[in-house]
């Protein structure tokens, strides 16, 4: 794993202030992995969970999947996302979603464009455009533990971390947290009714979904 994944890291990750944000989020989110979990890794910041699973030794104790069909192995990140290194098996996407739709996952790691005070998530409607929801709704609706991985703000955010201390060097001009999301990709009300565990992991803190909305459960050193 290490030889290939580190080689891919060097060409697929742009080392910048933004990669620091992704690293902080990915490291914290990866702590939600449990031995024998069957896991879905979403595109974007959630890809970092795979890398920290590798670094912590959890990669050999869980089964990572991506919606394109790979099961087991190490998901490739960046522009090649969807491919798997050393996959145990590869199915077509329709069969992969049979696994997802029938509750075959233990935990999923997904991105988010907006989150509101109730815990609803918009993952498909951006400013002036519809990105498309893809398999997001299927995966998040049936998975017992859902971990959203996203930055607290966007557009211009710059973050550094030294010795575990997080510093916001420049705040982003767009807040990901809003009173009401533009469109609901993930329903907090339905998640509560289904008994799902839902976390919202950012580069500065972690929230958990409760029947009363979002509850702040962690604040990182320096914030």
Positions of the model-derived regions?
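Conserved phosphate- and dinucleotide-binding cores of soluble alpha/beta proteins
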Residues: 1-13, 77-223
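N-terminal active-site beta-alpha-beta segment that forms phosphate/nucleotide-binding
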Residues: 5-88
């Amino acid at each position: 794993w290490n030889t290939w994944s580190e080689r891919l890291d060097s060409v697929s990750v742009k080392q910048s202030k933004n990669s620091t944000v992704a690293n902080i989020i990915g490291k914290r989110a990866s702590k939600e992995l449990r031995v024998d979990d069957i896991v879905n890794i979403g595109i974007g910041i959630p890809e970092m969970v795979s890398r920290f699973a590798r670094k912590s030794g959890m990669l050999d104790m869980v089964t990572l999947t991506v919606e394109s069909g790979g099961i087991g192995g190490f998901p490739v990140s960046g522009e090649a996302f969807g491919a798997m290194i050393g996959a145990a098996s590869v199915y077509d996407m329709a069969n992969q979603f049979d696994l997802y739709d029938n509750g075959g996952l233990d935990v999923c790691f997904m991105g988010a464009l907006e989150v509101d005070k109730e815990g609803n998530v918009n993952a498909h409607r951006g400013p002036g455009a519809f990105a498309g929801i893809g398999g997001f709704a299927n995966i998040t609706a049936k998975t017992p533990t859902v971990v959203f991985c996203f930055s607290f703000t966007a557009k211009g955010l710059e973050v550094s971390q030294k010795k575990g201390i997080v510093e916001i060097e420049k705040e982003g001009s767009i807040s990901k947290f809003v009173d009401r999301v533009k469109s609901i990709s993930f329903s907090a009300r339905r998640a509560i009714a289904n008994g799902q565990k839902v976390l919202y992991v950012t580069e500065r803190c972690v929230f958990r979904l409760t029947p009363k909305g979002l509850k702040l459960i962690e604040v990182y050193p320096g914030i």
